[in-house]
Amino acid sequence: MSKETLVLLYGGRSAERDVSVLSAESVMRAINYDNFLVKTYFITQAGDFIKTQEFDSQPSETDKLMTNDTIIASQKIKPSDIYEEEAVVFPVLHGPMGEDGSIQGFLEVLKMPYVGTNILSSSVAMDKITTNQVLESATTIPQVAYVALIEGEPLESKLAEVEEKLIYPVFVKPANMGSSVGISKAENRTDLKQAIALALKYDSRVLIEQGVDAREIEVGILGNTDVKTTLPGEIVKDVAFYDYEAKYIDNKITMAIPAEIDPVIVEKMRDYAATAFRTLGCCGLSRCDFFLTEDGKVYLNELNTMPGFTQWSMYPLLWENMGLSYSVLIEELVSLAKEMFDKRESHLV
């Protein structure tokens, strides 16, 4: 039986490029090489596409994906050179220029099936402010109170709005970033100004969100029209909040899978996750993140259309708990990618 070609894109231009490399390494090792030939391409911070390695069998423990320190400059290609008939692309890219619709649009122009959600829903879900506004207008899913700040708005009046509508502590987030990059906790106005300045380094749109004392719960989502969800998992923190260092550097978190939650609340979360996924027009996969307060209130935090895929990431572990191994999960994602590609092509009549 001939093998299917899977193209891995990793790296990227965003501040989340290091997370992308970690995720791609894990995907590379989890693939069933009886079924796939894997071709890898590294995207540099400057946006150049570099042809890196090919794998037709299980990589050894010493095999590492090439990155900035090991890429060969002469292997630079035109982005369109990744095209290969019948190949499927797995864009293991996080953050802007990776999961915001940019690479998805490029792949649709190339007429290549790709893992993950489409242009519009990638773009909407990537922006936390837009996600909140869409879900507010179209669903009854609870969200924590927030204030949106757009660069150029009068800062003092926006600070006053925050202090009128919210209570310290608040969390300040770049609207268009993930992996906790650029997020700060503000206990007072001085903190708030500093947090806004930091967030504006990453995006011109900033979400200022009411801090809540809550458990952090996540639900995995898989499917196109037939949407499946996992039992929830919980992030058990040993730090003040689940920041970038805690997630990917210090490993100061543990996970409880499945989370110990009242079954009624579990079903509510799974229903909210599927509803948000459909409302935003998603397909393929996502991870829906929630806050769960001590008195049982559930708030949707965000929908992540390309969740982390490292060996300690919640998304693949959630599906493993449901009986779907990492390698079979990848095969299912490839199948869903081809299904959506065929559907998009059929609509061009």
Curated annotation (Swiss-Prot):
Its cofactor is Mg(2+); Mn(2+). Pathway: Cell wall biogenesis; peptidoglycan biosynthesis. ATP binds at residues 163-218. It is an enzyme of class 6 (ligase). Cell wall formation. Belongs to the D-alanine--D-alanine ligase family. This is D-alanine--D-alanine ligase. It comes from Streptococcus mutans serotype c (strain ATCC 700610 / UA159).
